[in-house]
Amino acid sequence: MNKEEMNARQKKIRNFSIIAHIDHGKSTLADRILEQTGALTHREMKNQLLDSMDLERERGITIKLNAVQLKYKAKDGETYIFHLIDTPGHVDFTYEVSRSLAACEGAILVVDAAQGIEAQTLANVYLALDNDLEILPVINKIDLPAADPERVREEIEDVIGLDASDAVLASAKSGIGIEDILEQIVEKVPEPSGDVNKPLKALIFDSVFDAYRGVIANIRIMDGVVKAGDRIKMMSNGKEFEVTEVGVFSPKATPRDELLVGDVGYLTAAIKNVGDTRVGDTITLANNPAEEALDGYRKLNPMVYCGLYPIDSSKYNDLRDALEKLELNDSALQFEAETSQALGFGFRCGFLGLLHMEIIQERIEREFNIDLITTAPSVIYHVNLTDGSNIVVDNPAEMPEPGVIESVEEPYVKATVMVPNDYVGAVMELAQNKRGNFITMEYLDDIRVSIVYEIPLSEIVYDFFDQLKSSTKGYASFDYELIGYKASKLVKMDILLNAEKVDALSFIVHRDFAYERGKIIVEKLKELIPRQQFEVPIQAAIATKIVSRSTIKALRKNVLAKCYGGDVSRKRKLLEKQKEGKKRMKQIGSVEVPQEAFMAILKMDESK
């Protein structure tokens, strides 16, 4: 292909993604676009085609990214090359969204005609604006009885400040308005900039591990050309590989001779480790490298930690294999081996957020058939010690004794909640209970309000989202971003069973809430732990001070049953003998803690 042909081809490329809040119809719209452009025959079509994981289909969310090349013959008679890059919509995967948006020049903003703008729609729109994308608003689900497209149009203009006068009214489900969307992409989304003669610069926006070909990196070519046989270099770590294949997804992987400027496709190079192809990194040629990498790359650090233990301890090695396999596709997942006196051998795992944690747990249980016990999630605390040193604690059991702690800092997030104004009071009460500081509140229209709070991340990781949904009858939508660390009065609470600490039940709590949390958890454990042959005291303690206690009464056999009348001294002798036996049992007896007891720590707020 000569230079003129390359330039002409570049002018026909349109790279775009679809951004939307969960359930506003993003995956359905992607399905319709694939159908309309003839990428798939009707026979191959299935709903949520780009959501390839079962879990994605069931939960109706997109977790992994997918990129598809489509050909579209526009009304002007020209054939255009579309690259549709699917993005996850959930707050845990914000970084992945920002990188996949960086691979585009335009974004279709899908807003539900009945529900209007939600918190995550806004969060993703701001990401798109940061990447200077052309945003095309689409008001979806106009065939719903509750649809009010005019109100939503005003909302888009007032809340986001986009001109929505020519927003497409569509229904992805019934296929209304799809052609208008495709025409708008041709007219409004800019062609890719970039120079085919410059050294190669390719942005990695996703990578997947394949057992036979190694890592398959999804890339967008910003400058230059890449073809099989090229020696490439990763700019963040300097590692070099030889390209074995390049190609595009249409939607099946289709090998090509080369990928040119503006193309979105994949590349394989016998890379063994997904950690070498980190999302956001820049690929260049080893013998003719680019001078500087593309902006915006950062290493992802986990925000939430929890312990995963196999219920059957013989499956420990299987769990390690499962985590290693998941890590191949998920460079944000971190894990290290740990042991607990109560739970045996397991792993301490780090996740991007709560959804990420749930998905990993569910995939281990489903795909690898391992039943898990999970400990309460915790965040990373910065602890300043009295000798002037600092340590980082991600496991409550590792928190030092109070005597050596100068201060403890915990991560705070800025939480944005969008909610109908009938529920403002409920949301504010919930945020206050979670130690939130009120920042701002604004009315988006007559019905909906946006409320912003600063809340400690540790309060959100328990069950903030569930409580928010139940206190607003499911109408609230929620988004958060990390803003930094602040000092707090935090203490570690230990739970003692039969005077022995159970390390897996320790948790970190604010001093002001310590007494009531201790009381709740002791009562809950009393209900959940089965009665033993001897009585079991349950205590909640901060350092050496016991703040709450309860006792599980012993089961006892009626040793007097055989006495009938009998002398009182005979009865007393039998009772004394039983008492002796119970005492001896208590000294050597151990208490089995059921899985529900660990979950009780997570759910303790609900009984307040």
UniProtKB/Swiss-Prot annotation:
Pfam families: EFG_C, GTP_EFTU, GTP_EFTU_D2, LepA_C. Transmembrane segments: none annotated. InterPro entries: EF-4, EFG_III/V, EFG_V-like, EFTu-like_2, G_TR_CS, LepA_C_sf, LepA_CTD, LepA_IV. Residues 11-193 form the tr-type G domain. SUPFAM superfamilies: EF-G C-terminal domain-like, P-loop containing nucleoside triphosphate hydrolases. GTP binds at residues 23-28, 140-143. GO terms for cellular component: plasma membrane. GO terms for molecular function: GTP binding; GTPase activity; ribosome binding; translation elongation factor activity. CDD domains: EF4_II, EF4_III, LepA, lepA_C. Its EC number is 3.6.5.n1. Keywords: Cell membrane, GTP-binding, Hydrolase, Membrane, Nucleotide-binding, Protein biosynthesis. It is found in: Cell membrane. It catalyses: GTP + H2O = GDP + phosphate + H(+). It is an enzyme of class 3 (hydrolase). It is a peripheral membrane protein. Its main location: membrane. One of its GO terms (biological process) is positive regulation of translation. Required for accurate and efficient protein synthesis under certain stress conditions. May act as a fidelity factor of the translation reaction, by catalyzing a one-codon backward translocation of tRNAs on improperly translocated ribosomes. Back-translocation proceeds from a post-translocation (POST) complex to a pre-translocation (PRE) complex, thus giving elongation factor G a second chance to translocate the tRNAs correctly. Binds to ribosomes in a GTP-dependent manner. Belongs to the TRAFAC class translation factor GTPase superfamily. Classic translation factor GTPase family. LepA subfamily. PANTHER family: TRANSLATION FACTOR GUF1 HOMOLOG, CHLOROPLASTIC, TRANSLATION FACTOR GUF1-RELATED. This is Elongation factor 4. It comes from Listeria monocytogenes serovar 1/2a (strain ATCC BAA-679 / EGD-e). The lineage of its organism: Bacteria, Bacillati, Bacillota, Bacilli, Bacillales. The gene is lepA.
